[in-house]
A protein has these predicted regions:
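Solvent-exposed loop segments of extracellular immunoglobulin-like
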Residues: 7-11, 98
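Extracellular Ig-like/FN3 beta-sandwich strand-entry sites
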Residues: 8, 43-45, 133-135
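Recognizes extended acidic, P/S/T-rich segments that occur
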Residues: 10-42
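Surface-exposed loop/turn motifs at beta-strand-loop junctions within extracellular Ig-like
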Residues: 17, 52-56, 142-144
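Beta-strand-rich modules
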Residues: 34-59
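Short loop/turn motifs at secondary-structure boundaries
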Residues: 65-160
Length: 160
């Protein structure tokens, strides 16, 4: 900050959540060289600002800089509901998902599973009985926190 005759003690790059609360702060060199490594998986919209602290303790804040991250959404192509704790549930994965729907059908077009809960997946059962090993069709739709819509359709192999 050039307006302080006493000079700058330090600059901090701050990350703020959607409510404006600082959840990350890092001191940076006086040339303000800063780079972000990796995707922040907690916030889809990240607000950055620079906090300047003068040698006499005065504080000044920059304007906000907003970064909007794209959501992610995908489905597996196989699962093994055999009770071993590995890939027993067929469920969607993703980041920043707000709304969700999933429908699964057998090869005859009969519905075997449906949910609107992103955390819920298919356990490989039809009417509480183990489904036969086969290829099943699915259609999934998700909406992220920014309103972007993701649509997937394809097949899932149930392996025993």
């Amino acid at each position: 900050y050039e307006g302080w005759p006493e000079g700058v003690q330090e600059y901090l790059v701050e990350k703020l959540d959607e409510s404006g609360k600082v959840y990350f702060s890092q001191s940076v060199a006086k040339n303000l060289d800063y780079s972000e490594k990796g995707l922040d998986t907690n916030e889809q919209i990240i607000h950055f600002r620079v906090k300047g602290i003068s040698n006499s303790g005065r504080v000044s804040y920059s304007n906000y800089f907003e970064v909007r991250q794209k959501g992610e959404f995908y489905m597996p192509n196989a699962f093994t509901p055999n009770g071993d704790g590995l890939n027993d549930i067929c469920h969607a994965e993703g980041l920043f998902i707000k709304d969700f729907s999933l429908e699964i059908w057998d090869k005859n077009g009969a519905g075997v599973f449906a949910t609107n809960s992103f955390k819920q997946g298919w356990d490989g059962k039809i009417n509480d009985l183990p489904a036969p090993p086969d290829v099943y069709m699915y259609r999934a739709e998700a909406v992220d926190k920014l309103g972007f819509v993701y649509k997937l359709s394809g097949t899932i192999q149930l392996i025993k």
